Amino acid sequence: EYKFNGGKEFVDDRGSITNYELPEPINWIGWIESKKGTVRANHWHPIQQQKCILISGRYISVFKDLKTPNAPMTTQLMEPGDVVVTEPQVAHTMVFLEDSLFLNLVNGEREHDNFGKHTIPYELVDERMRVELLEHYKPECRSCGNSRLECVVSLGNTPLANNLLNDENQEDELYPLQMNYCPECHNCQLSHSVPREKMFNEYLYVSSTTEVFRKHFSDTADLLTEQFGLEEGSFVVDIGSNDGVFLKPLQEKGISVCGVEPAKNLSYLAEQNGVPTINGYFEDESTLSQIKQEADLVTAFNVFAHSDNLEQITRNAFQIMKPDGHFVIEVQYLYNTLKDVTFDNIYHEHYNYWSVLSLNNFFERLDLQISNVERVDTHGGSIRVYVGTQHHLVHPSVSEFIQKEREFGLDKLETYKRFSRKVEECKEKSLKVIKILKDDGKSIVGYGSPAKATTVLNYYGIDSNSIDYIIEDNELKHGKLLPGVRIPIQGKGGVLDENPPDNILVLAWNFFDYIKENNQELVNRGCEFITLKD
């Protein structure tokens, strides 16, 4: 399914004329009025191409290619003047965000009672999904408000990445997982906003689980302490502080700290570790009011991906800072996601996907500016961004990053379309490899159950028929099931030693070397360590 607008526009003091060129003649026009909150279609046509033009209102067009096995569900927002063309054998549904009027443009017969000989019922959008789309679809750019967003890639309806299942009887909750691109400010974001409470009130990702991240945050604490002259009496606030992994090294230097963490279990862990932590969301006034001291430094590591209310978070950060304070964030780098095709970093917790270009546009709208940018080797490629008021000196790194991004094409839609095609190629290649291994009678065990594992395994359709179980170092995940594909997760224990598999599929691929080095006995016994990126 695709949409287009008219062209060859003529404008004078009477108004405007927009012309549409259709690929075939029209012999029927259907005038269709639809009320806000209702659904139409939920069907597919075996032979007839469908076309309609929206006259007024707005609706979400939902479609799925039935010719392609395991094709994902995709959405796009339709606004007045848009023509949508739905090809044969494509299931489609219309979910109306407003009272709307559209015209069906038909070439052929049109006599049928709701579902006649031209249409075949297909419940693409059930009642639960209707409500989800009406309540949580994000039609406008979170950064600039533009509603003309373009789909980059749809990974279908998938479960929440870190909401592991307790047992086989627990049902999966599925939500649309689709990344859109804003041509105006070059922000990338998810089309659907799952309520924050569903994802962050209890959280199983613990930053201190791996030595890699403990070292990263310890090194970052040393760097920022020296860079900003932090000392005893200085005060640092960390937004989304997890278990206090960044603040603890600062505490040991005699620096006063305060974490803000929405997950109750992680707040408790941090407090048990002696790190003062407020359990709440930083964008909420009730949380902000508990911070009684002005901060020399406010940090937000990977928070800018995880929030649907970034403007308020940013304003709050500067509200609690001293006039000469500093705001430092880290985000996964969109440049690396596209260049390295690390699409498994796309999941519901990550509302936003950032480049320096898009972050710069975001902060400029708040009368702030990026003063420096550094590369960070975490999560498959990240950036550390220093943000200040307009009077701060700007390091050459800012323009250097933006120039590199423009050269790569982060400001061009075709770059994102090319990424989408590469994602499809990765899926096809990986499924062939898994099939060859299983056809040869090889056993496969997963290693690591990060959020990215939920994305890639559900998108590929790889379940417990292919992967026997997943080994996980984080004890909070032991005994649970990866959602959707329902692969059991367990501790390492002695199970690998007793019956080592032929292949260990490292799902936490950003820790591949670390995991392999710490399991040399399995390498010596003939286990082959692989990733879905091989």
What are the language-model segments listed below?
Residues 379-422:
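Flexible, glycine-/basic-rich loop-and-beta segments that form/coincide
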Residues 311-326:
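A short glycine-rich, Lys/Arg-flanked "PGG" loop and its adjoining helix->strand segment in the class I
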Residues 163, 329-352, 356-359, 363:
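Short, glycine-/aromatic-enriched active-site segment of Class I SAM-dependent methyltransferases
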Residues 136-212, 374:
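N-terminal juxtadomain amphipathic helix
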Residues 66-87:
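Short acidic-glycine-tyrosine-enriched beta hairpin
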